[in-house]
Regions:
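C-terminal cap of thioredoxin/glutaredoxin-like
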Residues: 7-22, 51-62, 139-228
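A short, compositionally biased domain-edge/stem linker segment
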Residues: 23-33
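N-proximal short alpha-helices
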Residues: 32, 67, 71, 175-178
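A short, charged/proline- and glycine-enriched loop
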Residues: 34-41
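Asp-based phosphoryl-transfer active-site loop
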Residues: 41-48
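Structural alpha/beta surface segment adjacent to cysteine/selenocysteine redox centers
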Residues: 47, 53-146, 216-228
Length: 228
C-alpha cells in the first residue's frame, strides 16, 4: 500500500470514528432527556492512587461549574497482572509522576510527611464506609484523600471512627460497579457511556458538558481554567 493510500485509509477511519462517536453521544443524550435524568457523572477514586488525589482536587469545581449529579465511589486497585503488570513498579512511578504534576499544578503533595500514612489505610476506609450513604460522604472522601496524600498522619487519625463500617464490602461493591460499566482503573470519570481518565482528560468532559448546555451561568472557575 502506498503512503497516499495509507493516509487516505487513516483519514477515513478517523472520520468514521468521529461520526460513530457523535451518533452514540446523540443517542445517549436523547435517552437522558426522554428519561428526565440529570447529567450523571460517576467518579471512581482509590485512596492509594495519587492520580485519584490529583483528580479529586478539581471535582468540587467541576460540580460547581456544570449542572451535573456527581457521584463518588471509592474503589480498590485491580491486582490482576493482565491489567496491572508489576504493580509495585507502577505504584513507584505513579508517586514520582504525580509529585511532578502536582508541583506544576500547585497542588500540595506529601508536604506534611514523606509518605502517606499507610498504617491507617484500612481504618480510614472503614471509617468512610460508615458514612457511604450520607450526604456528607463526598466531602469527607475528598478531605480524607487529601490528608492521605499530603502525608498528614494527624489529620488522617482525626478521621478514624471507632464505630467504623465494612470497608471491604464497600470497595468490592464499587469495584463491581466499575467493572460492570466496562473499566478497571481508578482516577476515572464515567459519563454517558464514555470514560475520562485523570486530570488531563477532565477538560474533555468539561467541553462535552458545555456543548450539551450543562454549564452554569458563572462558568468554570479559575481552578478548572488553570488545567487547560
Amino acid at each position: 500500500m502506498s503512503i497516499g493510500s495509507k493516509l487516505r485509509s487513516t483519514l477515513v477511519n478517523v472520520l468514521v470514528n468521529e461520526r460513530t462517536q457523535s451518533a452514540k453521544r446523540a443517542i445517549a443524550e436523547t435517552r437522558r432527556k426522554l428519561g428526565g435524568s440529570a447529567h450523571v457523572v460517576s467518579a471512581f477514586l482509590e485512596l492509594d492512587d495519587p492520580w485519584s488525589y490529583l483528580l479529586a482536587h478539581y471535582l468540587p469545581d467541576l460540580a460547581a461549574a456544570y449542572d451535573i449529579e456527581l457521584r463518588y465511589y471509592l474503589t480498590q486497585s485491580c491486582n490482576d497482572e493482565g491489567f496491572r503488570p508489576q504493580p509495585e513498579l507502577l505504584a513507584q512511578y505513579a508517586d514520582e509522576d504525580c509529585a511532578r504534576v502536582a508541583a506544576e499544578l500547585g497542588i500540595p503533595f506529601l508536604d506534611k510527611g514523606a509518605a502517606p500514612p499507610v498504617e491507617h489505610r484500612r481504618a480510614l476506609i472503614d471509617s468512610l464506609a460508615s458514612i457511604a450513604d450520607s450526604p456528607d460522604f463526598p466531602g469527607e472522601l475528598l478531605d480524607a484523600i487529601t490528608d492521605y496524600w499530603r502525608g498528614d498522619t494527624a489529620g488522617v487519625s482525626r478521621r478514624l471512627d471507632a464505630a467504623a463500617g465494612d470497608g471491604r464490602s464497600m470497595l468490592e461493591e464499587n469495584q463491581r460497579r466499575l467493572t460492570d460499566l466496562g473499566h478497571y482503573n481508578s482516577a476515572t470519570l464515567h459519563y454517558a457511556g464514555e470514560w475520562y481518565w485523570g486530570v488531563d482528560r477532565l477538560t474533555y468532559l468539561a467541553d462535552r458538558l458545555a456543548e450539551l448546555g450543562a454549564g452554569r451561568p458563572e462558568g468554570p472557575g479559575a481552578k478548572l481554567a488553570s488545567i487547560r
